[in-house]
Amino acid sequence: SFWSYFQNTYLCDSPNYNCRKTNLDIFSCRSEREFYDAFASAVLKQTSSKLEEWMENARLFLSRISPKISLGTEPMTDFSISLELNPKAADVDDILQLPEKIAQKKGIDIVVCIDEFQQIAEFKDSKAFQKRLRSVWQLQKSVSYCLFGSKKHLMNELFEKKSLPFYKFGDTVYLPKIGTEDWVDYICGRFEATGKHISAELAGKICRA
C-alpha cells in the first residue's frame, strides 16, 4: 500500500489532542457524484455522536443541496445520503467544506482518511475533479487528509506527475509488505474475536493464496 498525507495527522494519536478521524473507502465509487455521496455520509456519520447531531449538521451545512437521507435499522451507523447536486461550484464546495465547517463548529481538528484514492483517476473529467478537490482542501485549516492507495503506479502518477493537480500535495510514505507471521497473528486474532478458531497453518495458507 501507499499513501500521501497532508499536515500533521499523527497528532490524533495523542490523548491530549482534540481530534476526530473519518475513514472512507472509495473503491466502489465510479463517478464524481458517488464520491460526494460517500464523502458526505462518512463525514456526517463519523463526526457525530448521536442521530440528532448529524441531522442538524446536514441541515446546517448541506441545505442548498437538499440531501436525501435513508435510515436503516440502526440510524447512527446504518444510513446513506443521496445529494441532489446542481452544476454550481458552490454546491460542490459545500460538500468538500463539510469537515472544515464541522471542525470549526465543534472546536476540533479532523483527519479524513480516504482509501483506494487512485479510483478518482477513473472518473469522467478526472483532472477537473482533482483540481476542485485540491483547490478546496489546501485552504482548510482544521482538516488534514490521509490518502491511501493499493495501486502504487497510479498513486505515483497522481502525486508525482507535474501536470496533475495533486502534484506534491503532501508528504509521501511507502509502506512495506506485511510479513506472513504478522498476517497469521492478525487472522487468528480476528477469528478468536468472533469466538471461532483457525490454526496457524491454515491461516498461513490463506496468506499465501
Regions found by a protein language model. Give the residues of each.
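P-loop NTPase nucleotide-binding core
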Residues: 1-110
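A short helix-loop-helix "switch/interaction" segment in the helical subdomain of ASCE P-loop NTPases
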Residues: 201-209
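C-terminal alpha-helical "lid" subdomain
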Residues: 101, 105-109, 192-197, 204
